[in-house]
UniProtKB/Swiss-Prot annotation:
Its EC number is 4.2.1.33. GO terms for molecular function: 3-isopropylmalate dehydratase activity. The gene is leuD. It catalyses: (2R,3S)-3-isopropylmalate = (2S)-2-isopropylmalate. One of its GO terms (cellular component) is 3-isopropylmalate dehydratase complex. Catalyzes the isomerization between 2-isopropylmalate and 3-isopropylmalate, via the formation of 2-isopropylmaleate. It comes from Nocardioides sp. (strain ATCC BAA-499 / JS614). CDD domains: IPMI_Swivel. The keyword Lyase applies. Pathway: Amino-acid biosynthesis; L-leucine biosynthesis; L-leucine from 3-methyl-2-oxobutanoate: step 2/4. The lineage of its organism: Bacteria, Bacillati, Actinomycetota, Actinomycetes, Propionibacteriales. InterPro entries: 3-IsopropMal_deHydase_ssu (IPR004431), Aconitase/3IPM_dehydase_swvl (IPR015928), AconitaseA/IPMdHydase_ssu_swvl (IPR000573), IPMI_Swivel (IPR033940), LeuD (IPR050075). This is 3-isopropylmalate dehydratase small subunit. Disulfide bonds: none annotated. NCBIfam families: leuD (TIGR00171), PRK01641.1 (NF002458). Heterodimer of LeuC and LeuD.
Length: 202
């Protein structure tokens, strides 16, 4: 998992609330056995509508999704995070996230930045008026900045210290485990040989 410190990218306004994981990626797209290739299923039902924001060329290459409250509700679905990442999103900004989605995001390297609802509304308005506007998210200072000059919007965002640490260090669950490799090896070296053990796959 790559380390996350700051990211600047085109912001895209998703003016919808209560977006659940089945809307993010329908279950029919969950049959792959890898973590890649899910971008085609992202918001699949909505993308059939030519007026849907992801179909607007003004937001081409967007990597910062600015969504309404209660984003990522519904069933726990890592694929929802993977679909967002496969599409190119590095950050989702919302006034409120479902706990499970926020947890899955942190483990996979997608930053879920929680800001006040009034901030989301201001960013939406700015992005609507100026498609292609860049949004900078700084994890070290926990700040979001959209636009430049007198029209710029800057605000702090909330993220728990543990998830922030994982993202800054680029640590997924396997990375955290490998950080204890010496202790694990030391334990295994003194473990009685008659006890059950796993073996390396060939």
């Amino acid at each position: 998992m790559d380390k996350f410190t700051t990211h600047t990218g085109v912001g895209i306004p998703l003016r919808r609330s209560n977006v659940d994981t089945d809307q993010i990626i329908p279950a029919v797209y969950l049959k792959r056995v890898t973590r890649t290739g899910f971008e085609d299923g992202l918001f699949a039902a909505w993308r059939n509508d030519p007026s849907f924001v992801l179909n607007n060329e003004g937001y081409a290459g967007a990597s910062v999704l600015v969504a309404g409250p209660d984003f990522g509700t519904g069933s726990s679905r890592e694929h929802a995070v993977w679909a967002l990442q496969n599409y190119g999103f590095k950050v989702v900004i919302s006034p409120r996230f479902a706990d499970i989605f926020r947890g899955n995001s942190g483990k996979a390297g997608l930053l879920a930045a929680q800001v006040d609802e009034s901030v989301v509304q201001k960013i939406w308005d700015l992005l609507d008026e100026h498609p292609g506007t860049a949004v900078t998210v700084d994890l070290e200072s926990r700040t979001v900045r959209a636009g430049e000059g007198v029209d710029a919007i800057e605000a702090s965002f909330d993220i728990d210290d543990y998830t922030r640490w994982r993202l800054l260090e680029g640590l997924d669950d396997i990375g955290i485990t490998l950080g204890h490799a010496d202790a694990i090896a030391s334990y295994e070296a003194t473990r009685p040989s008659w006890r059950p053990a796993t073996i390396h796959a060939h």
